[in-house]
């Protein structure tokens, strides 16, 4: 509808809404890296790879990269440190980073990450070793195959969109949100999950669970991804069981001094 009348405000709203749903697909792809979308692994991987493919993410590659984040949290091998490391850095620093995200200047880094490119810890200037080397030959093969499928899908989609006369709409309403809004959402969520935590050596204080109004939950924390502390303690629990996990841990008084905050507290608002 936004493209039919080409109203700039409606187009901007459409881009923002589509980006939130693209982000939600990445969250489902994340769950599949843990083999937690469906019990049959073939179905888990089929759905996870499909969710990732349409948003430029190689799920099989992300599976390898994301394991390093769990196994080496806050260490030089953690591929997520460029997003969440070194905070607090001040609001102006974050504003500059988000400006770059919204301008599409960090898109190549975002999707290079999902394709297994080594990351650099900006705090220590240490470049991690190639993350895809740290796994089995079978997973390496699956990741390589998946990357070709993702790349092929997007080349084909672009060709078909232009052939059908919808090339501009495809670029504006699918590629542009992926290149601008999605990297910003990923950065903000990473900061909520791990930015400026109290104790990187404690399982209950190195990751953070964030509570927010329902509208913000829909934008920034789809599929219960706000329960990040619980996810790091129990990564085998699927996303739809994380609220139950939180309630059980509350009953057991397991959250003493744990990183559980509102989003306003996380950002010091």
What are these regions, as identified by a protein language model?
Residues 1-20, 28, 53-172, 239-269:
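Non-catalytic, topology-defining segments of multipass membrane proteins
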Residues 6-9, 32-40, 118, 191-199:
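Membrane-interface elements of multi-pass transporters and channels
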Residues 19-29, 58, 98, 106-110, ...:
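Transmembrane alpha-helical segments that form the membrane-embedded catalytic/substrate-channel core
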Residues 25-34, 62-74, 189-196, 221-237:
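Histidine-centered catalytic micro-motifs
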Residues 37-56, 78-92, 96, 201-216:
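Juxtamembrane helix-capping/reentrant segments at transmembrane boundaries
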Residues 123, 127-138, 204-227:
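Active-site-proximal inter-transmembrane loops
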Residues 197-201, 233-234, 244, 250-252:
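Polar-ligand-bearing catalytic/cofactor-coordination segments
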């Amino acid at each position: 509808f936004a493209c039919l009348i080409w109203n700039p405000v409606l187009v901007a709203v459409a881009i923002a809404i589509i980006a939130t749903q693209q982000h939600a697909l990445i969250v489902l792809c994340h769950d599949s890296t843990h083999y937690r979308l469906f019990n049959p692994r073939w179905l888990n991987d089929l759905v996870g790879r499909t969710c990732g493919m349409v948003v430029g993410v190689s799920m099989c590659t992300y599976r390898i990269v994301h394991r390093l984040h769990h196994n080496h949290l806050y260490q030089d091998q953690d591929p997520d440190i460029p997003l969440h490391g070194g905070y607090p850095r001040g609001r102006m620093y974050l504003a500059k980073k988000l400006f770059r995200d919204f301008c599409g200047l960090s898109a190549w880094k975002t999707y290079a990450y999902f394709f297994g490119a080594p990351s650099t810890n900006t705090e220590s200037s240490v470049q991690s070793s190639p993350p895809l080397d740290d796994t089995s030959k079978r997973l390496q093969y699956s990741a390589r195959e998946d990357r070709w499928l993702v790349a092929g899908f997007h080349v084909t989609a672009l060709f078909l969109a232009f052939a059908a006369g919808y090339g501009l709409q495809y670029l504006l309403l699918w590629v542009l949100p992926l290149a601008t809004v999605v990297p910003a959402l990923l950065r903000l969520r990473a900061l909520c999950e791990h930015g400026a935590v109290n104790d990187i050596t404690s399982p209950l204080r190195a990751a953070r669970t964030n509570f927010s109004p329902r509208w913000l939950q829909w934008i920034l924390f789809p599929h219960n991804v706000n329960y990040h502390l619980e996810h790091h303690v129990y990564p085998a629990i699927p996303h739809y069981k994380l609220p139950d996990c939180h309630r059980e841990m509350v009953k057991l008084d397991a959250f003493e001094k744990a990183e559980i905050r509102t989003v306003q507290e996380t950002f010091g608002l």
